[in-house]
Amino acid sequence: MRCPFCHNDDTQVLDTRVSDEGDTIRRRRRCAKCDKRFTTYERVELVLPAIVKKNGSRVEYSHDKLASSLKLALRKRPVSSDSVDESIARIEEKLLSLGEKEIPSERVGELVMRELKRLDKVAYIRFASVYRSFADIESFESALKELK
């Protein structure tokens, strides 16, 4: 670790502690050249995968887009905002746990549908009708049969 005072690369770790939450490591360091002390913090950087769209283009994952899609499907439905937030967190945790740099948009859509099916059946059908491009009443009937 480079010293922030003299920019020397030779530093010693004097003390290491894990935060109460267990997600951060605090290290107290001393520079071998100027003898000044400083503190560093280490955290895991969690990066959600890029989304590969149906046309092959790649876009950065957007928490806001996921949230707006869920909220649109759940509009005027009796589902609390806390439940929506928990569903978003579950979807994002699943995306992170896959450990992939890229993921097809279809996979994200399936995760959303799984959460909506759990939250509200009407919202599930709303989302599925757009996501799966329902063209006729038979498509709706087929999706309704899946729910039974």
From Swiss-Prot:
Signal peptide residues on this chain, from the entry's feature table: none
GO biological process: negative regulation of DNA-templated transcription
Keywords: ATP-binding, DNA-binding, Metal-binding, Nucleotide-binding, Repressor, Transcription, Transcription regulation, Zinc, Zinc-finger
Gene Ontology MF, one: DNA binding
Keyword presence, Methyltransferase: no
Transmembrane helix keyword on record: no
Domain of life where this protein originates: Bacteria
Cofactor(s) for this UniProt protein: Zn(2+)
Free-text cofactor note: Binds 1 zinc ion.
Paired cysteines (S-S): none
Annotated ATP-cone domain residues: 49-139
ZnF (unnamed) intervals: 3-34
One Pfam family in the UniProt entry: Zn_ribbon_NrdR
Purpose: Negatively regulates transcription of bacterial ribonucleotide reductase nrd genes and operons by binding to NrdR-boxes.
UniProt xrefs under HAMAP family: NrdR
Protein family: Belongs to the NrdR family.
Name of this chain's protein: Transcriptional repressor NrdR
Species whose genome carries this gene: Polynucleobacter asymbioticus (strain DSM 18221 / CIP 109841 / QLW-P1DMWA-1) (Polynucleobacter necessarius subsp. asymbioticus)
Upper classification of the organism: Bacteria, Pseudomonadati, Pseudomonadota, Betaproteobacteria, Burkholderiales
Gene name in the database record: nrdR
